[in-house]
Amino acid sequence: MQCPSCQNTDSRVLESRAADAGRSVRRRRECLHCDFRFTTYERVETVPITVLKRNGNRETFNRSKILNGLTMACQKTGLEQDRLESMVNELELQLQQRSGREVNSAEIGEMVLDQLSEMSEVAYVRFASVYRHFRGINDFVAALEGIHANKEQLAAVR
Protein backbone atom coordinates (compact mmCIF):
# COMPACT_ATOMS: atom_id res chain seq x y z
CA MET A 1 0.00 0.00 0.00
CA GLN A 2 1.40 3.39 -0.97
CA CYS A 3 2.03 5.86 1.87
CA PRO A 4 -0.07 9.04 1.45
CA SER A 5 2.79 11.09 2.90
CA CYS A 6 5.91 9.91 1.04
CA GLN A 7 4.45 7.52 -1.61
CA ASN A 8 6.73 4.68 -0.49
CA THR A 9 5.12 1.27 -0.98
CA ASP A 10 6.60 -0.43 2.09
CA SER A 11 4.30 -0.45 5.09
CA ARG A 12 3.36 -2.76 7.91
CA VAL A 13 -0.06 -3.50 9.31
CA LEU A 14 -0.42 -2.46 12.95
CA GLU A 15 -4.03 -3.48 13.45
CA SER A 16 -6.84 -5.13 11.45
CA ARG A 17 -10.51 -5.39 12.29
CA ALA A 18 -13.89 -5.84 10.64
CA ALA A 19 -15.80 -2.71 9.66
CA ASP A 20 -19.18 -1.94 8.07
CA ALA A 21 -20.84 -4.91 9.78
CA GLY A 22 -18.22 -7.29 8.41
CA ARG A 23 -18.40 -6.07 4.80
CA SER A 24 -14.94 -4.52 4.92
CA VAL A 25 -11.65 -4.72 6.81
CA ARG A 26 -10.12 -1.65 8.43
CA ARG A 27 -6.32 -1.69 8.69
CA ARG A 28 -4.01 0.73 10.52
CA ARG A 29 -0.68 0.88 8.72
CA GLU A 30 2.70 2.46 9.32
CA CYS A 31 5.07 3.49 6.55
CA LEU A 32 8.46 1.82 6.97
CA HIS A 33 10.17 4.78 5.30
CA CYS A 34 8.73 7.87 7.07
CA ASP A 35 6.79 6.30 10.01
CA PHE A 36 3.55 8.00 8.89
CA ARG A 37 0.45 6.15 10.12
CA PHE A 38 -2.65 5.82 7.97
CA THR A 39 -5.85 3.81 7.68
CA THR A 40 -6.99 1.69 4.74
CA TYR A 41 -10.21 -0.21 4.07
CA GLU A 42 -10.61 -3.40 2.05
CA ARG A 43 -13.92 -4.38 0.47
CA VAL A 44 -14.95 -7.27 -1.71
CA GLU A 45 -15.05 -6.14 -5.30
CA THR A 46 -18.58 -6.51 -6.56
CA VAL A 47 -20.10 -6.64 -10.01
CA PRO A 48 -21.20 -3.11 -10.86
CA ILE A 49 -24.90 -2.31 -10.78
CA THR A 50 -26.31 -0.34 -13.69
CA VAL A 51 -28.95 2.28 -12.92
CA LEU A 52 -31.59 2.97 -15.57
CA LYS A 53 -32.36 6.69 -15.36
CA ARG A 54 -35.75 8.27 -16.11
CA ASN A 55 -34.42 9.76 -19.34
CA GLY A 56 -33.32 6.32 -20.59
CA ASN A 57 -29.61 6.75 -19.87
CA ARG A 58 -27.64 4.11 -18.02
CA GLU A 59 -24.97 4.81 -15.44
CA THR A 60 -23.03 2.85 -12.85
CA PHE A 61 -24.52 2.83 -9.35
CA ASN A 62 -22.87 5.56 -7.29
CA ARG A 63 -23.41 5.20 -3.55
CA SER A 64 -22.05 8.70 -2.89
CA LYS A 65 -24.93 10.24 -4.87
CA ILE A 66 -27.43 8.60 -2.56
CA LEU A 67 -25.42 9.47 0.53
CA ASN A 68 -25.14 13.12 -0.55
CA GLY A 69 -28.90 13.31 -1.16
CA LEU A 70 -29.60 11.74 2.21
CA THR A 71 -27.16 14.05 3.96
CA MET A 72 -28.90 17.10 2.51
CA ALA A 73 -32.37 15.76 3.33
CA CYS A 74 -31.33 14.94 6.90
CA GLN A 75 -29.64 18.23 7.78
CA LYS A 76 -30.71 19.46 11.22
CA THR A 77 -32.92 16.41 11.85
CA GLY A 78 -30.66 14.79 14.42
CA LEU A 79 -29.92 11.76 12.24
CA GLU A 80 -26.23 10.95 12.44
CA GLN A 81 -24.00 10.40 9.42
CA ASP A 82 -23.13 6.89 10.62
CA ARG A 83 -26.79 5.92 10.46
CA LEU A 84 -27.07 7.28 6.92
CA GLU A 85 -23.96 5.38 5.85
CA SER A 86 -25.40 2.20 7.33
CA MET A 87 -28.59 2.82 5.40
CA VAL A 88 -26.68 3.21 2.13
CA ASN A 89 -24.63 0.09 2.93
CA GLU A 90 -27.83 -1.88 3.45
CA LEU A 91 -29.34 -0.51 0.24
CA GLU A 92 -26.23 -1.41 -1.73
CA LEU A 93 -26.22 -4.90 -0.22
CA GLN A 94 -29.87 -5.41 -1.22
CA LEU A 95 -29.06 -4.34 -4.77
CA GLN A 96 -26.02 -6.65 -4.94
CA GLN A 97 -28.08 -9.62 -3.78
CA ARG A 98 -30.52 -9.30 -6.67
CA SER A 99 -30.20 -11.59 -9.64
CA GLY A 100 -30.31 -8.74 -12.16
CA ARG A 101 -27.54 -6.18 -12.54
CA GLU A 102 -29.85 -3.37 -13.68
CA VAL A 103 -32.21 -1.37 -11.48
CA ASN A 104 -34.47 1.60 -12.18
CA SER A 105 -33.60 4.84 -10.43
CA ALA A 106 -37.26 5.02 -9.37
CA GLU A 107 -36.90 1.73 -7.50
CA ILE A 108 -33.80 2.98 -5.68
CA GLY A 109 -35.63 6.17 -4.74
CA GLU A 110 -38.55 4.20 -3.32
CA MET A 111 -36.17 1.99 -1.32
CA VAL A 112 -34.60 5.12 0.19
CA LEU A 113 -38.01 6.62 0.96
CA ASP A 114 -39.14 3.41 2.68
CA GLN A 115 -36.15 3.64 5.01
CA LEU A 116 -36.57 7.38 5.61
CA SER A 117 -40.26 7.04 6.49
CA GLU A 118 -39.21 5.01 9.54
CA MET A 119 -36.40 7.39 10.52
CA SER A 120 -37.63 10.97 10.05
CA GLU A 121 -40.76 12.50 8.53
CA VAL A 122 -38.87 15.72 7.82
CA ALA A 123 -36.08 13.92 5.97
CA TYR A 124 -38.67 11.83 4.10
CA VAL A 125 -40.52 14.91 2.84
CA ARG A 126 -37.30 16.70 1.90
CA PHE A 127 -35.97 13.72 -0.05
CA ALA A 128 -39.36 13.03 -1.66
CA SER A 129 -39.75 16.66 -2.73
CA VAL A 130 -36.59 16.46 -4.82
CA TYR A 131 -36.95 12.85 -5.95
CA ARG A 132 -40.63 13.15 -6.93
CA HIS A 133 -40.37 16.73 -8.26
CA PHE A 134 -42.96 18.31 -5.95
CA ARG A 135 -44.69 21.26 -7.60
CA GLY A 136 -46.68 22.71 -4.71
CA ILE A 137 -48.04 22.37 -1.21
CA ASN A 138 -50.52 19.65 -2.22
CA ASP A 139 -47.61 17.36 -3.07
CA PHE A 140 -46.16 17.87 0.42
CA VAL A 141 -49.52 17.21 2.07
CA ALA A 142 -50.01 14.02 0.03
CA ALA A 143 -46.54 12.77 1.03
CA LEU A 144 -47.27 13.33 4.72
CA GLU A 145 -50.66 11.65 4.43
CA GLY A 146 -48.94 8.67 2.80
CA ILE A 147 -46.51 8.36 5.71
CA HIS A 148 -49.32 8.46 8.26
CA ALA A 149 -51.40 5.90 6.33
CA ASN A 150 -48.42 3.51 6.22
CA LYS A 151 -47.79 3.93 9.95
CA GLU A 152 -51.45 3.23 10.72
CA GLN A 153 -51.35 0.07 8.57
CA LEU A 154 -48.23 -1.13 10.38
CA ALA A 155 -49.80 -0.42 13.77
CA ALA A 156 -52.91 -2.42 12.79
CA VAL A 157 -50.77 -5.41 11.79
CA ARG A 158 -48.82 -5.38 15.06
From Swiss-Prot:
Pfam family for this entry, one: ATP-cone
Cofactor section: Zn(2+)
GO MF annotations in UniProt: ATP binding; DNA binding; zinc ion binding
GO biological process: negative regulation of DNA-templated transcription
Span of the signal peptide: none
Domain ATP-cone: 49-139
Chain ranges of zinc fingers (unnamed): 3-34
UniProtKB keywords: ATP-binding, DNA-binding, Metal-binding, Nucleotide-binding, Repressor, Transcription, Transcription regulation, Zinc, Zinc-finger
Cofactor note: Binds 1 zinc ion.
Family: Belongs to the NrdR family.
Function: Negatively regulates transcription of bacterial ribonucleotide reductase nrd genes and operons by binding to NrdR-boxes.
Protein name stated in the entry: Transcriptional repressor NrdR
Species whose genome carries this gene: Prochlorococcus marinus (strain MIT 9303)
Gene: nrdR
